[in-house]
Design a protein with these regions (language model features):
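Short, charged helix-to-loop "capping" segments that act as catalytic/coupling loops
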Residues: 8-19, 42, 52-56, 95-97
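Short, surface-exposed coil-to-beta transition loops
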Residues: 5-7, 56-60, 82-87
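Generic structural detector for well-ordered beta-strands
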Residues: 9-13, 62, 89
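Hydrophobic ligand-binding cavity/cleft-lining segments
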Residues: 1-39
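Glycine-rich portal/gate segments that line the openings of hydrophobic small-molecule binding cavities
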Residues: 31-78
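A short, structured loop/turn motif at beta-sheet edges
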Residues: 17, 64-69, 90-98
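Beta-strand/loop substructures that line and gate deep hydrophobic ligand-binding cavities in soluble
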Residues: 75-128, 132
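Hydrophobic pocket/interface hotspot
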Residues: 19-21, 30, 45, 63, ...
Length: 132
């Protein structure tokens, strides 16, 4: 199935690469803003939304690449589109020195707005949990 590439850039209220790197590349960091529970095992992240004692849903993403202090690239294990991936990367403005979180993801045709809304909710949780 053909998917559309989505790019989102989110300015962050920090100049600390280390803080952002922890939030995008570790289970503990991702758990603060993407899912209720995240664990890393065997080169994969398992993302769970919902509580263990109630209804919950888990998805597993293989870690394709990590460039320390720069980016992490993931691919959902159930992904049918060969070119689809998720990439979270850190960029720095040459002018302001401000850090930006860049997100690349892929949406099914007609589902682009829903995917953007999902990421906007995640980014709002990132802001509330970390102040960024």
């Amino acid at each position: 199935m053909k998917k559309t590439k989505i790019n989102i850039e989110y300015p962050l209220n920090t100049k600390s690469n280390k803080l952002i790197w922890t939030l995008i590349s570790t289970a503990e960091g991702l758990q603060k803003w993407i899912a209720d529970y995240v664990k890393e095992e065997d080169g994969r992240f398992v993302f769970t939304r919902g509580e263990a004692w109630t209804e919950n849903h888990s998805l597993t993403a293989k870690i394709l690449h990590r460039e320390p202090m720069r980016s992490v690239k993931l691919r959902w294990e159930n992904e049918e589109c060969d070119e689809a991936y998720i990439e979270l990367s850190i960029a720095k403005s040459d002018i302001t020195g401000q850090q930006t979180l860049s997100i690349t993801d892929y949406a099914e045709e007609g589902d682009e707005d829903n995917l953007r809304d999902l990421w906007e909710g995640d980014l709002e949780r990132l802001h509330h949990s970390s102040g960024l």
